[in-house]
From Swiss-Prot:
Protein name: Protein translation factor SUI1 homolog
Native species: Methanopyrus kandleri (strain AV19 / DSM 6324 / JCM 9639 / NBRC 100938)
InterPro entries: DENR/SUI1_TIF, SUI1, SUI1_arc, SUI1_arc_bac, SUI1_dom_sf
A Pfam family recorded for this sequence: SUI1
UniProt keyword annotations, A-Z: Protein biosynthesis, Translation regulation
Length: 106
């Protein structure tokens, strides 16, 4: 068994590891909101995921593909170009397994 097949958090093989599911259940609040960066330009910001032990770069990549937009992950936030609040909320609930109660859209 290779070292990258073992979860660094719990030490179990990755196929038996449940750390990510447990961390998704214990997320306090994921905030999804928009912010105007320039006149006529809006970005969607997702924050509160860094506490869950989730790979922000990987999730940002999935969200960019789902929303067909550009974006980045930095400083504990995912920033997507455009207003994608509802798409992001549905994606996090249906495809990533987060609880509806843990997501706040403003």
């Amino acid at each position: 068994m290779q070292e990258d097949d073992i979860c660094p958090v719990c030490g179990l093989p990755k196929e038996l590891c449940v750390c990510e599911e447990v961390s998704k259940e214990t997320v306090e609040k994921i905030k999804i909101y928009t912010e105007q960066v320039r006149p006529g330009k809006v970005v969607t910001i997702i924050e509160g995921l860094d506490d869950a032990g989730i790979d922000l770069q990987e999730l940002a990549s999935k969200l960019k593909r789902e929303c067909a937009c550009g974006g980045t992950a930095k400083e504990g936030k995912i920033i997507l170009q455009g207003d994608h609040r509802n798409k992001v909320r549905e994606f996090l609930i249906k495809k990533e397994g987060f609880s509806e109660d843990a997501i706040e859209v403003t």
